Amino acid sequence: MTTRQPIYKSLYFQVIVAIVIGILIGHFYPDTGKALKPLGDGFIKLIKMVIAPIIFCTVVSGIAGMQSMKSVGKTGGYALLYFEIVSTIALLIGLIVVNVVQPGAGMNIDVSTLDASKIAAYVTAGQDQSIVGFILNVIPNTIVGAFANGDILQVLMFSVIFGFALHRLGAYGKPVLDFIDRFAHVMFNIINMIMKLAPLGAFGAMAFTIGAYGVSSLVQLGQLMICFYITCALFVVFVLGAIARAHGFSIFKLIRYIREELLIVLGTSSSESALPRMLIKMERLGAKKSVVGLVIPTGYSFNLDGTSIYLTMAAVFIAQATNTHMDITHQITLLLVLLLSSKGAAGVTGSGFIVLAATLSAVGHLPVAGLALILGIDRFMSEARALTNLVGNAVATVVVAKWVGELDTDKLQSELASGGSAILETRPEDDLGVAEGPTPGAAVNTTKTV
């Protein structure tokens, strides 16, 4: 029988305290808050440092260990189908809500008076986005370049190809697979060490956000923010909740299960900061490693529900605020463009704003200079985007795993019932809970049976 650790030692509690202190420092000592930005940036860089090798190890180990390669294609096909359906629903919900509530109506902003200099970099980056360019960018110029740049889709593509090739080698490739499994243990132990700094990273990022933008920036455009936050919450509870209920689990229990990851995302405004832990947690939840390795990384570009809601709401808000007429044809065009452009948003801070810039440029009817209206509050809105994205990818993983018959439902219910509270104490073999690698002489195949 294990003893539950004191609450002050839990990451959940530590991150909450860090966020609260960061808000207070940023509000009362804004200059100090802005100076703490390197703490948040440093933490995210530490996480990004190990994301590429972790994705590689997880995907390769999962694919190479599968009995049939048909399962990989089936999983990928179901995942993309789910992503397209749910992200389209998210885009539609954002479009409907912003038309009903009309948060930008009555602002009567003259576009010529807006300072477009601050958004120039975003517009330039957005203009570089194209469908063909996005597809070609998935193919890395070099293997080393994919890992050096940390491009999730490039790393994922190479990992899938490597996994297929390793599977074809059969027993001859087993030493390589054994090495990758052991290397994965090292990477996840590095994550375990980095996560001890999560409260510090959340503290620095939150202090900077409040110090740089201030609470006053929330008041001016508060209606849009409140509308967006409520829409995201309703989407999670009713849309994702209905999907979860239809597949035999509770959305609220799932949220409780990933509460630590949600708090890390809240503090850093980046869903990417929780990616390594999500890979482990979703596997512990009963999803097969091969499914988790494909769905989670792919979802970070193709299943961003919060970003989808944001894109339609922000685009129409700019039209309303600048009195730019948008009839049904314009809005359908916007929706069709977003169905493609939204797939290029990675789970990093600021990517949603770049995609919005690309969308406004592509549509042509909307004033790109209107981006200056929401630049000041985008950082605050990115938190709701990232949280919704994370929950959406967690639901997607469980659903796709169930669709392809790679979900241990008994384990799912058991883990959700426990809330993941004993995750560090009771399983010394788990990657997040150990400080040492596999025991010498032990079996080298670390793929967990589900």
Curated annotation (Swiss-Prot):
InterPro entries: C4_dicarb_transport, Na-dicarboxylate_symporter, Na-dicarboxylate_symporter_CS, Na:dicarbo_symporter_sf
PROSITE patterns: NA_DICARBOXYL_SYMP_1, NA_DICARBOXYL_SYMP_2
Gene3D superfamilies cross-referenced by the UniProt entry: Sodium:dicarboxylate symporter
NCBIfam families recorded: PRK01663.1, PRK13027.1
Similarity field: Belongs to the dicarboxylate/amino acid:cation symporter (DAACS) (TC 2.A.23) family.
Role played: Responsible for the transport of dicarboxylates such as succinate, fumarate, and malate from the periplasm across the membrane.
Protein name: C4-dicarboxylate transport protein
Originating organism: Pseudomonas syringae pv. syringae (strain B728a)
